[in-house]
A protein has these predicted regions:
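N-terminal cap/lid segment of alpha/beta-hydrolase-fold proteins
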Residues: 77-78, 82, 120-122, 126-167
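Short beta-strand element of the alpha/beta-hydrolase
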Residues: 170-179
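Alpha/beta-hydrolase active-site loop
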Residues: 214-237
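Alpha/beta-hydrolase fold nucleophile elbow
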Residues: 236-248
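Hydrolase active-site cap/lid region
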Residues: 259-315, 333
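Short beta-strand/loop motif that positions the catalytic acidic residue
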Residues: 331-332, 337-339
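Conserved alpha/beta-hydrolase "acid-adjacent" motif
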Residues: 344-350
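Catalytic histidine-centered segment of alpha/beta-hydrolase-like enzymes
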Residues: 369-382
Length: 400
């Protein structure tokens, strides 16, 4: 359903009280190895996140060899299939660049799952590096090619990917922000759909993930200001026609930028983005046990804050609330809010907070949907193609 709502009365600020939470035993028990294997295969069979891009028969092959959840063992058995496809890609590169690009992409997808949901061991870090190498192979063989753009942010090198449509002198740009466990390389494959609409994309890891090695904290949004500065200085894209979109945790940054960079954005898409309630201890104590997430949710969420313990994690989150930081009543760039009513990772109440405060906004809510609106039948890709992509193109004034 599509909603547009205006609420002239600001809500009272709700200050979260940190309760006594000292043991991970408070959280739901993680899946056993057998349960995890069964869930992975079920998701692969129906092409569901995070294995939607993996061949179901090859997934079955890997699962037969998966003996434990040890992170290095995990990286090794999944990465072995990536190695197989990488060898094929290298052999194809001299004779069939298009097929080589496709096969490099396939290899990258396996390496990405070998490091999922984060790089927290030697093996998973190696898998991520292999994913970067495979993506580099994809980038140089795909047409049009992908440019790796590097810039400095407070002494830290940040890397993003720019890809431009053919035949468009100064195309508008969509900045796509990775989420908690996804990476800019994943997004760059789906982002190819923008090219057919005359839109360039700049793909970028959110703070605390991938190659954006800065901690999530108030003020980390300034890294996106540097990206906007860099795009504005280029003569091959239109830095005055920019929309930003970020999935899940990346949606937090989309919403933030809709306020902090409203004068430089034509719009912001917020699919399942954390706003306020997500950051509260009571929500996290419930959400960290969700079976909607495959495994390792606490580890992935804690890592982007740079903390290790549950107590430190719960204490850290509230400082990121857009409500408590006074953003919600400020003017904003136009927003498209996307989520499912049954999201167990980010509360639907966060979408309502954005919708009910500040400037008018648009929203697409799936009454049966989980995180970011997805269901078994309505995939992330379908939502992207039918909801997000058309809205972004309209905001940019590009051709449909």
């Amino acid at each position: 359903m599509k909603l547009t709502r205006r609420n002239a009365v600001s809500g009272a600020l709700a200050l979260a009280l940190l309760t006594s939470t000292t043991a991970m035993a408070q959280l739901a028990t993680p899946r056993t190895l057998d349960e995890l294997k069964a869930e992975i295969q079920a998701r692969a069979d129906r092409k569901a996140y995070p294995v939607s891009q993996l061949d179901a028969a090859e997934v079955r092959e890997v699962l037969a060899n998966l003996k434990s959840q040890d992170r290095d063992h995990w990286a090794s058995v999944w990465g072995a299939i990536g190695d197989r496809h990488l060898a094929k890609a290298k052999a194809l590169e001299a004779t069939d660049k298009a097929q080589a690009a496709h096969t490099y992409d396939t290899a990258m997808q396996w390496y990405m799952f070998a490091r999922f949901p984060l790089e927290d061991s030697a093996g998973t870090a190696q898998a991520y590096q292999k994913a970067l190498d495979a993506f580099a192979g994809y980038s140089r063989n795909v047409d049009p090619p992908i440019e790796a753009v590097k810039f400095n942010y407070n002494g830290t090198e940040i890397v993003g990917y720019l890809r431009k449509p053919k035949g468009v002198a100064k195309p508008p740009v969509v900045i796509t922000i990775g989420g908690l466990d996804g990476r800019k390389e994943d997004g760059s494959i789906r982002n190819a759909a923008y090219l057919a609409k005359g839109v360039a994309f700049f793909a970028f890891d959110m703070p605390g993930t991938g190659q954006t090695r800065i901690k999530i904290e108030p003020g980390a949004d300034k890294v996106y200001s540097v990206v906007l500065d860099a795009l504005a200085k280029r003569d091959d894209v239109d830095g005055k026609r920019v929309v930003v979109t970020g999935g899940s945790w990346g949606g937090h940054w989309s919403a933030h930028l809709a306020y902090s960079e409203k004068d430089r954005l034509l719009g912001a898409v917020v699919p399942g983005g954390p706003v306020h309630n997500y950051f509260q201890p009571e929500w996290q104590k419930k959400a960290l046990g969700t079976r909607e997430y495959l495994f390792g949710l606490f580890e992935a969420r804690a890592a982007v804050y740079g903390v290790k313990t549950l107590d430190d994690f719960l204490a850290y989150g509230p400082k990121m609330s857009l409500k408590d930081r006074g953003f919600l009543e400020k003017p904003s760039a136009p927003m498209l809010l996307v989520n499912g009513r049954n999201d167990t990772q980010v509360p639907i109440d966060d979408l309502q907070l954005l919708l009910n405060n500040g400037d008018p906004k648009e929203a697409w809510v799936n009454p049966q949907g989980g995180h970011m609106g997805r269901t078994a039948q309505l995939t992330d890709q379908k939502i992207f193609e039918t909801v997000v992509l058309p809205w972004v193109v309209r905001r940019l004034g590009a051709s449909m």
